[in-house]
Amino acid sequence: VALQWVIQEPEKRDMKTKLAHMIDGMQDDLTGFKQPVKAPKKVNSDYLAMYMMGDHHFGMLADGETKMAGDDADWDVKIATSILLDSTNRLASRVGDAEIGVLLNCGDFFHADSSANTTTKGTPVDVDTRIAKTFKLAGRLFQALINKMLETHKKVVVINVRGNHDSDMACHLSSCIELLYAKEKRVDVLQNYSKFIHYQWHNNLFVFHHGDRMKHEQILQAVIRNLDDEWSQSKNRYCHLGHIHHHTARELGSMHFEHWGSLTATDSWHSSEGYGAERSMTAVVYHKDTGEDSRVKIKVG
């Protein structure tokens, strides 16, 4: 028992440090709890707006000068913060009066999963700053995003899918947001202990997965097997994924699969391998009975 405790202790200290940095960052200069955000006066309970945040790779460092000619976009925590805030603000102003707003992080919000500057599986990556500072700045960013959505929607649901870059960090992120908004009844943070998350709203079933190491057919079978009640109760069935950094859509059986694009610039490795896609963020509006109603897309250069 003593040996096991010694092995686990550094990990526990690391998690406590991350939690402390995020809470400190959220409370430094943001006033969400001291001055609660006022709910909108008029909303339409027939509609839900889902903000699709593709792989954001917060904490990644990309220098345009080191990449393929024409692919010269830089990326660091300041740029990542500015672009995501601007895109979310623009989407919030255009999605209408939907009662519920869902902030969906499709996974890989963080570029690295530990202070070793590696992904969850240990792949080295280029980072902008220390993991503790990255986590602190992420806390500030998420509070700003959620508070903006609280101005537009009566209720905000936060979903953090666990990616292949940030499986552990995504769990810490959800725990911190849940603690911070524990007294705010208008915010609901879904648990992300599993890589599969689902959310049922009236006649709509939403399933979320990062999309790594899992084919659509496998996801469909897992949903039918494990969510049979929710499946039978919902006419409109959607699976939202990230991972591939560009938008694709497919209808398999009676379920719609979509991988969502990303606002992120390419890093030097992906650029050298010829990868790249349109950089965008989309919000989809759903009707409680008939499913998807409309969508708005914001593109960045």
Label each residue range with its predicted role:
Residues 1-44:
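Non-catalytic propeptide/linker segments at domain boundaries
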Residues 60-61:
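Glycine-rich active-site/cofactor-binding loop and its immediate structural neighborhood
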Residues 15-22, 71-75, 126-129, 166-168, ...:
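A generic short-segment signal for beta-strand/edge and adjacent turn/coil regions
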Residues 150, 177-195, 200-300:
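Conserved beta-sheet core of the metallophosphoesterase superfamily
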